[in-house]
């Protein structure tokens, strides 16, 4: 492992594999920007072999928000560098760099004018910068190098595959558990509860390469169909035999023990049974309990009384014990009876229900993953995790080296941000691209901080980071904290800088960092505040409600002082008053957030929970809105009364009673809801809800309440969602039914609750969400909460150092390793929490720490409490804090008896700025648009319409699609059944073309006649079962028709990895589409007598979708399927007829456009691509004419190099 050295951004080598460890607040983003500038300019020492442009520098991070932020920061650095270099070029005075040490050092060996030119180009092209999320990068590579990845161009990215998982979890439950006998089904229902419960247990680890650690490997290897009868059924059978044996033997057992209890022993002999435990009266109760258990088919657990008192080993343990009084007596002779030995043998032969339940869960997991995999093999939906898996697999297969080389060629340099959040699959991808085949002209930098690896629950793997760290050629670290005031930095150094592994693992080191000396300080009522303030409760227990109250009152005092201009941040040059938005309260989850928010609300302090993941459908407003919609849909007494009884209308019981009693009042309400119904029907639901909002004064009413902003935000959000959903539902009733299902949680769409306000509010945020952020003042009210016992988890997963694998410890044999992982992450979470503040942190702690392990307790004791969940004794909190205070001198305040008292409710005034809409003064070009071949061809025909003779009118508006006109005469199914052999008489029209295209898209070409898929095709064509054989024969003929005598290949010969189906494209028109130049080019170089195109000049893009692109013998071919009906005989599909149809429908224009699009695509992804050498040609397959004979129904052309080259200039 390379030694870690301080980073110098000027000298860091850029042509190797390096790792940068960036502790919290040490300027990681600034460092990335500095290295980016060096790469753009080929500047500094140990620089890259050539200057790179923004498209060649790959920067990968893990969230969309981080990606946008990083792009913004890099753009700002480039702009700043342009301004400073420009100023320096004019003055040659280094003061132009304004104390920018990096640029000052960088300019020493820089051609300033060339550098400014390159930076301006980079600034202009930042929208093209290769700054992506990990999933965005994977998707781009899969699509761009589709022939190497085998990915379908029409893949549908699904952010949330919950609906699929629910579907497959239910399927598995039905398929395997419904047929079980009563006892086995009872076991499943009790242990696994429901498919939803199983998903909640498995979801976090689905898709991981998870090995199971268990002694009985066979229980894992058998399929579920064998596991259930052999193991679950076998358990129930053996258990029933045990119960039956007990019932048969109960009287005998009772007699044996009774005889022993009344047996006389010599006075100098200890008894074989302890008669204080075993008594005749107790014996009867014990046996009755076990009898009841034996007669209860629902109870599958081993009875504890049976285990404790009637097994041979437990009886031997329960002999009379030697004491001081009877120490002279002879030892007891162990009591033995074959019946107890037999009972023990039977019990020990049983697998524990806990293990059996986990094994069943393992098989459920395997079945669920297989269902998901099978589904995705046959469908285009792909999740984010699938993108990673597919790229990783593509890089490992036979063409993986070539794919890695192409990616390396495209991105010779890569930086991976937040690398501590990586996993083994992500590292395998970048390892394959950059580490396995290092080249002189490539560089790879991993940037992260193992101390901030807190996303294990999302699949992040700290051990992958540590492995990558060991494999890096060089390791660097950032050594100065720019975020926090000096004394806060000193405090973190004091807490974590101790020898006993502050982060549990030896290879996660803590290095004390330096800090700035020019930071502001926090002053309260004229006095400088300590960096750390601890409030100790009088209770020894963690009382979260009390701690939340202390936190809220402390914040109230801060804000009161701020209102009096007595809470300020200042130094000699700068002064600013504390605002509510400067304060953050860090919590672990929404429950803690609710406690704090509630206490703040009591004191009149508005706050916002920034980590709210709840659905808006779970809000009270959603339920009340459902009542309102019911009344609008059904204008009747009961629905209207239910609606106006909601909080939205603000009526009380007396008001509603008055409405019921007063006919005029009631009629007004009935008329209102009738009007709302009409608005819904005529203008839509959004218009209706806005009408209700205005007429009923709902906004004013809600905003007058404490939770008003939250409720109004939810109302408006739901109105938007309902408006969007209305487009998908045919009636108001259907929309209301959908809305009620969303509230109930059925197949719920993603609708995360929105922030209620962006005003100056106290922020409440989870520690996980706060990572990477900073706040002026930070409150940590719940850090003393004891750690949860990791062994209590149902699924225990840990990393095995010996096996270098993630293991499911199904038998709980390695709880020490599990505890280490859990505690290590708790410490990393603590580190993140303690490094968010800029000026002060405040804590609420109990008088004593609990006897359970706690991360803050661990660092305050400098690791002395060890790594066991249960501690020997509790520790006095004040004593621990005093040790910390001694190191920090005057920068720690310990309040042992918080004398905070709540003040009167605050009224915080916020300035409301007046806003005015800007006036648009620009000019929008109206001729930019996205068109298609179909639009171009139809426009051409419309132009010709006015010059053609009336006798040709019937053909003017032919759609020129891949199928016959919608107006073509349909052949009935009845006629088809009379003449099944003539496939040429298939129905005509759009439906047929669409169905055939879908069939070709979904099937392997070697399996076009697959019975299951043929049935789907037949049904979509509305043909009965008698047509199945004809369809199969026809599709067999299509797949085996040689496309060309020259290349000698049929569709059936194509490997799936050499095909891209339904390849969409956007062909950019570089300037304007020059119609005259297009016609001139065709006349000069096109061998078909194509007519002149009549079309307007436009700019923009031409879009389309190529049915098939395939690769054969190193050449690329374009294929289009046509289901056009040309006649009832095969002679109607000969080469002359096909050529005539190609010209009549202008398909030659289509394939020239498609060829140009494919040509440009291949230029961008195939190294050293050459059209003359690499492009094979175009096949148009007229499916009705393909009968297995060479080139039957197949039109082929290969546009000349000159034609495509000139067309490339036309578009």
Curated annotation (Swiss-Prot):
Transmembrane segments: none
InterPro entries linked: DNA_helicase_UvrD-like_C (IPR014017), DNA_helicase_UvrD/REP (IPR000212), P-loop_NTPase (IPR027417), PDDEXK-like_dom_sf (IPR011604), PDDEXK_AddAB-type (IPR038726), RecB (IPR004586), Restrct_endonuc-II-like (IPR011335), UvrD-like_ATP-bd (IPR014016)
Cofactor requirements of the protein: Mg(2+)
GO biological process: double-strand break repair via homologous recombination; recombinational repair
Cofactor note: Binds 1 Mg(2+) ion per subunit.
UvrD-like helicase C-terminal domain segment(s): 500-772
Residues binding ATP, per UniProt: 22-29
Keywords of the record: ATP-binding, DNA damage, DNA repair, DNA-binding, Exonuclease, Helicase, Hydrolase, Isomerase, Magnesium, Metal-binding, Nuclease, Nucleotide-binding
Domain of life: Bacteria
Residue positions of the active site: 1120 (for nuclease activity)
Family: Belongs to the helicase family. UvrD subfamily.
Comment text on domains: The N-terminal DNA-binding domain is a ssDNA-dependent ATPase and has ATP-dependent 3'-5' helicase function. This domain interacts with RecC.
Name of this chain's protein: RecBCD enzyme subunit RecB
